[in-house]
Amino acid sequence: MNDQHNSVRHSEWQTPVDSNNEPLLIHIIDDEESVRHSCNFLISSLGLPAQVWSSALTFLQQVDIYYPAVIVSDLMMPAMSGQALQAHLNQHDSPIALIALTGQGEIDDAVNMLKLGAADYLEKPINSHRLQEALARAQTLTLKRAELYSIKKLYAQLTEKEKQVAHELLEGNLNKNIAHHLDISVRTVEVHRSQVMKKMQAQHVSELIQKLVMLDS
């Protein structure tokens, strides 16, 4: 790849981390060994951890797709294409962000990948600074998706009545107004409200509102 020996400005790069303060892992998926090697070299130059895979199927068999990460994947691969991989991630509501690698004449396919939800695409040979930009975008995206996925799991624990109370709080209604709207006692509202805060892991109403807004966005 033409730019694999270009210098990378580390001073401009801040390594994103997950909720455990660990650097996000970059998964490189390509059936060509030379591409995997070159891409791994560029990503390692940024100080990021990377893991290489020769096929998307092997990746899916061995990786937890519900953990935030970034994939840099070729579009045209045997057994499972990059598009099929993106569709699989979508189907399973995975937070992982995918960057598609494209060759000449595959721009239409790359655009379709963006429509499917890919974070970005890169043309081969990969430019190191273009890769850095794409990784930054993908890392931000996977962390946002992971946060939303976590909130969805918390919200799914609420009962129907608790969801009603939660959305009344989102509207800014007081307990007595919520009681009137839902035809329940103020005391019952207080009990539901307490459960909502606990299940949604919110310390304050403002934190709860922020999480509910993310669900509605």
Go through the PLM ranges and name each one.
Residues 57-61, 83-95, 112:
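Short amphipathic alpha-helix used as the core "switch/output" element in two-component signaling
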Residues 194-217:
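Basic, Lys/Arg-enriched C-terminal extension of HTH/homeodomain DNA-binding domains
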Residues 76-77:
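Receiver (REC) domain active-site loop signature in two-component systems and cognate sites
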Residues 54-55, 80-85, 102:
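Acidic catalytic/metal-coordinating carboxylates
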Residues 106, 126-135, 181:
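C-terminal output helix
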Residues 1-27, 216-217:
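Non-catalytic signal-transmission and effector/linker regions of two-component phosphorelay proteins
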Residues 52-70:
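Acidic, metal-coordinating helix/loop segments flanking the phosphotransfer/catalytic sites
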